């Protein structure tokens, strides 16, 4: 929606195949007049909201199946303003402003309609909950990965060291090709890390390859993929998809596993009437709930969330994020959360690691990383996020493309694109010596030769 704000002149809002509102971009995003549009905009995790203090708003209910016949308004079943007229009579488009129309009998009440903030989910019963360690849950040291490409060695992850505490969310951000997913795959054992890499879970060393790990370790580390269509077996029912994971990770028999699967699905608010459905019969949001249910089949300590909401609309995204937060609070589950959506990462993360060309460039508490002073690369990332309210921030542009890891720049890997190097007084260092990741203030780390106080001054 932020991109739409900056790229489009006019916007049309569709629901259940019907155009429910249309107008200039400024009118639609700043003065919405249809309850559905109002609800969509309220679902967005805007700056300043955080899981520890704020629950995301959602739109109640679920979208109807396409092709259904409606006697009245297509949104009536989910609308807090709906009355008998809305359910029996189809509203026409009415003019609500210059070049602004809405299909609603109560458009004048829409901007001030009651907010919908659902209570916490009922949660998941967890008979096999693992005790949380006293220290770090996950600790990775000198994590590296080298691939062979055309006879050459290409290092795509370079000596990354991170930790995740029990009940904490560590966000991973960075441009495509920065190494986020490769790091996640190495943690999960799907890709073998280099022999110099050391990973421990609850103080116990993790084997680098998945087939060398115990069932206990596999159950303790799970993943929610970006695309549930590819992650769920379309030949199995929803219940069987989850129960197979329960059987493998918990040792239950078929009946016990099916019962546990029903508990997990119900805890994720998948209605019992859908437990025997196939994935193709479910919406994208419901598929992702099934995928999350499966990830929790083995009572994991840490779940890798690899772009888990990128394929979902903002209303479904808000519901999924709320459910993830509920599960985390219930069992102290930790998340490694990968996303290009910085608003989502800021909302759900406790700490954030910013990656570039396989290296951690900045690491710190979520608000510290977003509020600055920033590493120059983080500064550029944050400035590139289009604001939905139309406000204009100074855009810090990175020149050129991300260099190939097969031929990384000498010195700091960001130096050919760095927006702060020129005039910094340390250009010689930047182009010849790779900086170390150093603590610039308590709990805040940067990989940069430019003095921290100088960054603070130039970014003020």
Show which residues each predicted segment covers.
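A short, proline-enriched helix->beta-strand linker immediately N-terminal to the Walker B motif
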Residues: 297-301
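Conserved ABC ATPase "signature" region
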Residues: 41, 256-273, 382-383
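P-loop NTP-binding/switch modules centered on Walker-like glycine-rich loops
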Residues: 1-54, 308, 312, 316-393
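ABC ATPase NBD Q-loop/coupling interface
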Residues: 198-216, 369
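Short catalytic/signature loops enriched in Gly
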Residues: 24-136, 366-460
């Amino acid at each position: 929606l932020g991109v739409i704000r900056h790229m489009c002149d006019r916007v049309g809002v569709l629901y259940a195949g019907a155009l429910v509102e249309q107008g200039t971009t400024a009118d639609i995003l700043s003065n919405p007049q249809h309850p559905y549009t109002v609800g969509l905009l309220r679902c967005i995790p805007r700056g300043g909201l955080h899981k520890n203090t704020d629950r995301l708003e959602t739109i109640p209910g679920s979208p109807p199946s396409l092709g259904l016949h409606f006697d009245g308004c297509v949104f009536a079943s989910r609308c807090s303003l709906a009355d008998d007229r809305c359910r029996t009579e189809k509203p026409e488009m009415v003019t609500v402003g210059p070049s602004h129309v809405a299909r609603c009998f109560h458009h004048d009440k829409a901007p001030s309609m009651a907010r919908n903030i659902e209570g916490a989910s009922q949660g998941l019963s967890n008979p096999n909950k693992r005790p949380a360690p006293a220290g770090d849950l996950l600790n990775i040291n000198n994590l590296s990965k080298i691939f062979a490409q055309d006879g050459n060695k290409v290092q795509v992850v370079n000596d990354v060291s991170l930790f995740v505490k029990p009940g904490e969310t560590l966000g991973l951000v960075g441009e495509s090709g920065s190494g986020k997913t490769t790091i996640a795959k190495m943690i999960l054992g799907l890709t073998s890390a280099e022999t110099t890499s050391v990973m421990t879970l609850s103080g116990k060393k993790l084997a680098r390859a998945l087939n060398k790990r115990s069932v206990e370790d596999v159950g303790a580390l799970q993943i929610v993929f970006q695309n549930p269509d590819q992650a769920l077996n379309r030949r199995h029912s929803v219940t069987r998809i989850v129960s197979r994971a329960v059987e493998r990770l918990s040792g239950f028999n078929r009946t016990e596993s099916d019962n546990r699967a029903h508990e997990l699905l119900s805890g994720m608010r998948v209605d019992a009437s859908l437990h025997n459905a196939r994935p193709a019969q479910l919406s994208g949001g419901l598929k992702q709930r099934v995928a999350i249910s499966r990830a929790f089949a083995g009572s994991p300590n840490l779940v890798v969330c690899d772009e888990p909401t990128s394929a979902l609309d903002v209303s479904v995204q808000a519901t999924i994020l709320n459910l993830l937060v509920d599960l985390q609070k219930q069992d102290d589950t930790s998340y490694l959360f990968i996303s290009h959506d910085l608003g989502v990462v800021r909302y759900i993360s406790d700490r954030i690691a910013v990656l570039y060309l396989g290296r951690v460039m900045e690491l710190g508490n979520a608000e510290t990383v977003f509020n600055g002073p920033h590493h120059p690369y983080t500064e550029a990332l944050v400035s590139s996020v289009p604001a939905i309210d139309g406000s204009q921030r100074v855009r810090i542009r990175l020149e050129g493309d991300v260099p190939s890891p097969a031929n990384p720049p000498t010195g700091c890997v960001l130096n050919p694109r760095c927006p702060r190097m020129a005039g910094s007084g340390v250009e010689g260092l930047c182009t010849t010596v790779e900086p170390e990741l150093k603590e610039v203030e308590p709990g805040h780390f940067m990989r940069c030769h430019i003095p921290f106080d100088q960054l603070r001054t130039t970014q003020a």
